[in-house]
């Protein structure tokens, strides 16, 4: 399944939703954390990592994700290199203003 997003950088297609840490790619990329609201995925956090599979299970905001989502958050991933992932993360923070991870 795909989650399509739109930012000032253009359109992006994230894969997911991943609900199990074993499904996460051990690669560089951007991740969106979402919750379901009336059947639609609402972005609650955005991040980037050199290894998404390592980052998500040990993330310091996981307690926020669980609190905001009722312990039912979803992870969506977009694989990309370091330079692109930082730009894409910033663009998504601006476009979606997620409730978790104030920067």
Segments and roles (model prediction):
Residues 101-102:
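Eukaryotic N-terminal accessory cofactor-binding modules
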Residues 54-76:
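A broadly used, surface-exposed interaction patch
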Residues 1-50, 55-58, 79-98:
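GIY-YIG nuclease catalytic motif and its immediate N-terminal context
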